[in-house]
């Protein structure tokens, strides 16, 4: 038997799963959410237990949580921690929605082992990850989506193109930061993609219709299962096809009509209620020909949460953490508001350190940071963001 120096307390406690190692697509934005969640739990008198394995993050500082487990974010390590901390049956549950995609993938093993997930259920998380079932749900709700298909080889992809047509967006399933995602315009490019080292045997490949010239929109919201607060509707400055982590965006949106904004709010609330979301939800939309398409739904905090929090002056991660412990949204009297000042987020790229890298932006994420510009004039807000990003 291994030695265990853990001194388990009798206090009510919650385990927060962090984002793990920094990499393109999963960085410090998620750590921001974890840190503010820990502070929020402490204020409620709940013991906060952080599980993370990145010494460069703030969440692993000694004074952020009541207890820190510096362990890898895999099912074996996390389940062992849950077992150790729940000896007195005082563990309220585990928060998986603040650390990006990594902790979200552990939710199935946690549920199978009888560990409670705080917030959105695994059933809803799994539904969002399952492309076929999610597409069926969108069809049932009469919500538009780009045409899509799931294939396993080049032969199946050729058949799928008959109904989807070029150009398409293609990517392996279960990837982060748009890794190995490409925009394909013809059969030659499609064949080259399947002959590349992106393809892993027996793993599914996702094909989506590429909406040429569409505007991309990011929406962050919080729900308690009944009430929904839409904290921000962000309009991307680059057109759809550039990864959301690489695209500059504006809050409030610049070119969307009141009709489109109302439709985005309606769909966001409909999806949140249907999935019984508790905590964060992020939805990515595409707008083309005055039609609203749902690209993706993430039942977790997104990388834009810190930006929206600072732009609106609302501590979203703190509020969401309290929702996860049973507090109702009505307590905060939150309402969607349009700021008099403009906030513009701009991505920071490492091209000066990697001069041979491809400078053209696409669906695979390349940025390693972000900045924001604030001003009452939209043009000045953009200018400030460009100066901050050293562009």
What positions do the PLM features span?
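Short glycine-/small-residue-rich flexible loop motifs, especially phosphate/cofactor-binding loops
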Residues: 38, 107, 135, 158, ...
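A conserved helix-loop-beta module that forms one wall/lid of the active-site cleft
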Residues: 120-181
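ATP-dependent carboxylate activation and anion-phosphoryl transfer catalytic cores
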Residues: 1-12, 17-24, 31-92, 101-104, ...
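Hydrophobic/aromatic ligand-binding patch that stacks against planar heteroaromatic rings
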Residues: 40, 109, 137, 160, ...
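Glycine-rich phosphate-binding loop
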Residues: 98
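N-terminal Rossmann-like NAD(P) cofactor-binding module of classical short-chain dehydrogenase/reductase
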Residues: 95
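Short Gly/Thr/Asp-enriched flexible loops that form oxyanion-binding sites at enzyme active sites
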Residues: 101-114
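A short helix-to-beta-strand connector/capping loop
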Residues: 65, 113, 143-146
